[in-house]
Curated annotation (Swiss-Prot):
MF annotations from Gene Ontology: ATP binding; FMN adenylyltransferase activity
Name of protein: FAD synthase
Gene: ribL
Source taxonomy: Archaea, Methanobacteriati, Methanobacteriota, Stenosarchaea group, Halobacteria
Pathway this chain belongs to: Cofactor biosynthesis; FAD biosynthesis; FAD from FMN: step 1/1
Family that this chain belongs to: Belongs to the archaeal FAD synthase family.
Cofactor dependency: a divalent metal cation
């Protein structure tokens, strides 16, 4: 059985997330999704939803066999525990495949690193980014203060 791991923040679940996880599932027989904890999200604004809610939403997707919370300090701990055959990175994730492969090798984790395909919007106004969803909410519903999105960091 080929075990696949996909990981991400999965905040404000949207069709881009669903596509990523469905694509990742095609790399093997069993898909495990690791949901990042707030403490590990340093490259973009902090998640709006708590980690447990994000995990539960991801777990509800048909493509996902099991969803796990990430480790609060070391992102490689759940990967070591799951011992995957393949890790599939998201289309727009900032990680470099070679860097991830090297970090895995340093920890004695023997698995392939792949990159999921992207997905174009299928209809007008479809949003494939959590940031775009937040921006639309702020635009349509307004904000009590300037820079509300930046304040989430």
């Amino acid at each position: 059985m080929t075990r696949v791991v996909a990981q991400g923040t999965f905040d404000l679940l949207h069709p881009g997330h669903v596509h990523y996880l469905e694509d990742a599932a095609t790399y093997g027989d069993e898909l495990h999704a690791i949901v990042a904890r707030r403490t590990n999200v340093t490259h973009k604004p902090a998640p709006i939803l708590c980690a447990e809610q994000r995990r539960d939403m991801v777990a509800a997707l048909t493509a996902v066999d099991e969803a796990h919370l990430g480790h609060p300090e070391d992102v490689f701990v759940p990967i070591q525990r799951l011992d995957p055959d393949v890790i599939v990175l998201g289309f727009d994730q900032h990680h470099d495949e070679a860097d991830i492969a090297a970090a895995l090798a340093e920890r004695g984790i023997d698995c392939r690193v792949e990159r999921a395909s992207g997905r174009d919007p299928r209809y007008e106004d479809e949003l494939l980014s959590s940031g775009d969803i937040v921006d639309r909410i702020l635009k349509q519903r307004g904000s009590d203060c300037d820079g509300a999105r930046e304040g989430q960091r």
